[in-house]
Amino acid sequence: MKTKPIFTAIGSKGSGKTTFLRRIGQILFGKKFDVTSVANDCKDLETLITNNYYVVIDNLDNPPKTLNDALARIATGQIIKKRKLFTTNQELEFEVKCYVALTSRTPQFTRDDVADRLICIYLERFGLFKDENNLCKVVMDKRDEILSYTI
């Protein structure tokens, strides 16, 4: 799929945004999957989006402008072109193959091409908290069963 939606979990602290998206990743890719964050310069984001099939970027309450640009490239399916190191005129191309999910308490995605591709889920704060390690164990124990329903 060339263009991709961007799944976004929005809610207050303690609403399970990160836990929910982490579980999706663990169902798809196993127990070692985890969410990530991006630095203000977003230098490592291109590496993430060209080497993974699913990336969860956590706590995007004040995303840098460069992140909005990167999200637009992801959503529209652009190819990332770079000059090959130590060469003058050789170019490398990297396909953006991942789907991106975001978490935010107060989303600030103002670019219309990004906002149009967001699939937002709004979560409320839990009244009763459950231990995330136990939730992970339950999901991992039932992973095969969960995946069999998706096929």
Describe the function of each predicted region.
Residues 6, 61-62, 91-92:
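Conserved nucleotide-state-sensing and coupling region of NTP-binding domains
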Residues 29, 68-92, 123:
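Conserved catalytic/switch belt of AAA+ P-loop NTPases
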Residues 1-51:
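P-loop NTPase catalytic core of nucleic-acid-dependent motor ATPases
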Residues 53-76, 107-116:
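Conserved AAA+/SF3 P-loop NTPase catalytic/coupling segment centered on the Walker-B
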Residues 93-98, 107, 112-151:
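Phosphate-sensing "switch" segment of ASCE/P-loop ATPases
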Residues 24, 58, 71, 101, ...:
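Conserved RecA-like P-loop NTPase ATPase core
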Residues 45-50, 84-102:
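AAA+/SF3 P-loop NTPase mechanochemical coupling elements
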Residues 8, 54-56, 101-102:
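Structural motif
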